[in-house]
Amino acid sequence: MKIKLLSTWSELLKETDPIAKIKLAIHQKKVWDAVCNPGIEIIFDTALTGDGKTLAALLPAFYESQNLGKGLFAYPTNELIRDQAKQVEKWSQYLNLAIESHQLNSQTLAEFIKNEGISKIETLRTIANDADLVLTNPDIFTLIHRFFYNQYRGNIAHLSQTWFIYFRYVVFDEFHIFNSAQVTNVLDSIAFSRANATQKYPVKFLFLSATPDKLIQEALEKAGISIKVIKGNYQHGLKDSKTHRCILRDVELELVACQQTSGGAENWINDNLETINQFFRDYPTSKGLLIVNSVFAAKRIVKSLKNNYSCKFTIGENTGLTSLEIRKDSESKQLIIATSTVDVGVDFEINFLVYESLDSGTFIQRLGRLGRHEGFPIYKAIALVPDWVKEKFAEIYANNSEID
């Protein structure tokens, strides 16, 4: 079954922003205004994948630090931290700003302690003092605000207070995949911050997700905390526009019945290797991504393809067990074999996608990796789904339908 997904276009402001000197999407300006509004404590940006939620979050951190303080950005995976660090560097250079950012996870913290020869507490104080932006994960964020790093020395709350005095602009990216414990910790940190904030130095929280979970919003509303939900303005199927920017290109989506009990993606790859070869022959500048549900399946596929003389394209690997060196090397390969590590936020310049999915959420998230970058003659997605999913699609859409 084949479906054509029409391109998506995001509405832009009519005028160039006088501060950033670039044209912003409607939702980006709304986020900036909301963060600067003293009557709004918490903002949810639910703009679509590819519509610049990262830039929407960075602009207040770049230009409003005098009032907001420093920026603390929390991401659900370390892979996403690394990817977003590139975005910070890209935008700070493009906007000609000197921004000191720091990646903070268990590995970088250990390396910093080893290199500087100081204690963990002093290391965290140094990072807080030196960095304009800190990119971390929700677990490190929780350990800081729950006094974990300063349990046995003097005022156990001192380090947490230091961080929350400096970092009064807190961003949670892809928060819909936070587990229940992480959601609880986020709510706890919001309560802690509000209890310690003053009217002169308020704390602002920004949540980013194209597929938001309502749990956090409902909990905040029940607590009587003011929130603002911001959405993008979109049109579909345009050929050209002076008022909108194309954020997702037309995609040819093919739904293929593929049962895990029959070998799943591994069998499909073996049976359709020549089809993939032909795609790369027809479109030699193409870059592709294959996302499977299992790390072990991914590694078996990588090994199988590299040992198969019939495979005429180069292979890369990006899983939770893949070293940074191999991940970096994979960026130059024609087809990257990946897992859920790349589900959220990670930006690939690809025009060919094959993927399994666990549920409707991962179906949309993985499909959202495709069509984000111009310059390719075609954008092709093959979704490997159970029989009943394909049947449900067939009940709703005719073969070769066009949908937005």
List the model feature ranges, each with a label.
Residues 1-404:
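N-terminal helicase ATP-binding lobe
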